[in-house]
Amino acid sequence: MTTTLQQRESASLWEQFCQWITSTNNRLYIGWFGVIMIPTLLTATTCFIIAFIAAPPVDIDGIREPVAGSLLYGNNIISGAVVPSSNAIGLHFYPIWEAASLDEWLYNGGPYQLVIFHFLLGVFCYLGRQWELSFRLGMRPWICVAYSAPVSAATAVFLIYPIGQGSFSDGMPLGISGTFNFMFVFQAEHNILMHPFHMLGVAGVFGGSLFSAMHGSLVTSSLVRETTEIESQNYGYKFGQEEETYNIVAAHGYFGRLIFQYASFNNSRSLHFFLGAWPVIGIWFTAMGVSTMAFNLNGFNFNQSILDSQGRVIGTWADVLNRAGIGMEVMHERNAHNFPLDLASGEQAPVALIAPAING
């Protein structure tokens, strides 16, 4: 009899836990995805803060030339970063127990892998948690679909790109200047500015910002005046009412006269779908572009594509971009035996082996 009571009590505790996890009445919804999301994001955040402040230099290139990224080693908020794991580690999974000592793990950039793996798992679970909460509230699932855009972008730069390049040392450093360095090197090696998917991503991000500002200003400018209890609702709206609190017809008429009639939406659902879909699709394309360039399917090459009647090159902005990329790549490849292939495999240039005579 005692055993039966204990089993019922344990089952009751489990049921209470399940109800608490999946309850939509909590101040913050946890959900089953949250059971994984909370510890992984806490781990990633804690390790990032500690590494950003106090991590020792990391041998990122695998040539015994450590790069310091933490605040205690002379960096500031702008220049500091969690340096990616060493090129000597490559794509190997490198947890703490795989290193001979903690010093070796830190020297080879182990904290970077710890942060990005827990971070990616955490944001994946955050996406699943958005779907889970929408499902339990009877909502449509488009919130998590929109969130998949930044998730795919983070996955591209932290996971897909290092896999394609063969080493986690090619991943994006976790810092402001490190992000800029990643962008410069990416342009130098893959010519991302000439890739159509990157162009679509730029249109998505900047276009989404423009449309968001336009929409917010139009709605704010066409709000219906709030009424009191002694006034008719025909003069405005009542706080908490279910109907829209702004006049979309007025906003549509204003914008249609400002540009032209068919440049504005007179349907609220179409308008908000457009506002959501435009930046999301653009960022999806950017993530796909980074993922394809990870395997060296690079941007277009229009270098020296315009010649005059005598075969001489007429410089274009594509040539300027190419020369800038070559310069950035030379500065990036500090290792002499890893000279950029697109420079080492060019046409032979005549070299003067004897100093010319100077007739004074």
From Swiss-Prot:
<dbReference type="GO" id="GO:0010242">
    <property type="term" value="F:oxygen evolving activity"/>
</dbReference>
<keyword id="KW-0813">Transport</keyword>
<feature type="transmembrane region" description="Helical">
    <location>
        <begin position="274"/>
        <end position="288"/>
    </location>
</feature>
<keyword id="KW-0479">Metal-binding</keyword>
<dbReference type="Pfam" id="PF00124">
    <property type="entry name" value="Photo_RC"/>
</dbReference>
<keyword id="KW-0157">Chromophore</keyword>
<feature type="site" description="Cleavage; by CtpA">
    <location>
        <begin position="344"/>
        <end position="345"/>
    </location>
</feature>
<dbReference type="InterPro" id="IPR055266">
    <property type="entry name" value="D1/D2"/>
</dbReference>
<keyword id="KW-0249">Electron transport</keyword>
<keyword id="KW-0148">Chlorophyll</keyword>
<feature type="binding site">
    <location>
        <position position="344"/>
    </location>
    <ligand>
        <name>[CaMn4O5] cluster</name>
    </ligand>
</feature>
<feature type="site" description="Tyrosine radical intermediate">
    <location>
        <position position="161"/>
    </location>
</feature>
<dbReference type="GO" id="GO:0005506">
    <property type="term" value="F:iron ion binding"/>
</dbReference>
<keyword id="KW-0812">Transmembrane</keyword>
<dbReference type="GO" id="GO:0009635">
    <property type="term" value="P:response to herbicide"/>
</dbReference>
<feature type="binding site">
    <location>
        <position position="215"/>
    </location>
    <ligand>
        <name>a quinone</name>
    </ligand>
</feature>
<keyword id="KW-0560">Oxidoreductase</keyword>
<keyword id="KW-0408">Iron</keyword>
<comment type="similarity">
    <text>Belongs to the reaction center PufL/M/PsbA/D family.</text>
</comment>
<feature type="binding site" description="axial binding residue">
    <location>
        <position position="198"/>
    </location>
    <ligand>
        <name>chlorophyll a PD1</name>
    </ligand>
</feature>
<keyword id="KW-0464">Manganese</keyword>
<keyword id="KW-0106">Calcium</keyword>
<keyword id="KW-0359">Herbicide resistance</keyword>
<feature type="binding site">
    <location>
        <position position="215"/>
    </location>
    <ligand>
        <name>Fe cation</name>
    </ligand>
</feature>
<keyword id="KW-0602">Photosynthesis</keyword>
<feature type="transmembrane region" description="Helical">
    <location>
        <begin position="197"/>
        <end position="218"/>
    </location>
</feature>
<protein>
    <recommendedName>
        <fullName>Photosystem II protein D1</fullName>
        <ecNumber>1.10.3.9</ecNumber>
    </recommendedName>
</protein>
<feature type="binding site">
    <location>
        <position position="333"/>
    </location>
    <ligand>
        <name>[CaMn4O5] cluster</name>
    </ligand>
</feature>
<feature type="binding site">
    <location>
        <position position="272"/>
    </location>
    <ligand>
        <name>Fe cation</name>
    </ligand>
</feature>
<dbReference type="GO" id="GO:0045156">
    <property type="term" value="F:electron transporter, transferring electrons within the cyclic electron transport pathway of photosynthesis activity"/>
</dbReference>
<dbReference type="GO" id="GO:0016168">
    <property type="term" value="F:chlorophyll binding"/>
</dbReference>
<feature type="binding site">
    <location>
        <position position="332"/>
    </location>
    <ligand>
        <name>[CaMn4O5] cluster</name>
    </ligand>
</feature>
<keyword id="KW-1133">Transmembrane helix</keyword>
<feature type="site" description="Stabilizes free radical intermediate">
    <location>
        <position position="190"/>
    </location>
</feature>
<feature type="binding site">
    <location>
        <position position="170"/>
    </location>
    <ligand>
        <name>[CaMn4O5] cluster</name>
    </ligand>
</feature>
<dbReference type="GO" id="GO:0016682">
    <property type="term" value="F:oxidoreductase activity, acting on diphenols and related substances as donors, oxygen as acceptor"/>
</dbReference>
<dbReference type="InterPro" id="IPR036854">
    <property type="entry name" value="Photo_II_D1/D2_sf"/>
</dbReference>
<feature type="transmembrane region" description="Helical">
    <location>
        <begin position="142"/>
        <end position="156"/>
    </location>
</feature>
<feature type="propeptide">
    <location>
        <begin position="345"/>
        <end position="360"/>
    </location>
</feature>
<dbReference type="GO" id="GO:0009523">
    <property type="term" value="C:photosystem II"/>
</dbReference>
<dbReference type="GO" id="GO:0009772">
    <property type="term" value="P:photosynthetic electron transport in photosystem II"/>
</dbReference>
<dbReference type="InterPro" id="IPR005867">
    <property type="entry name" value="PSII_D1"/>
</dbReference>
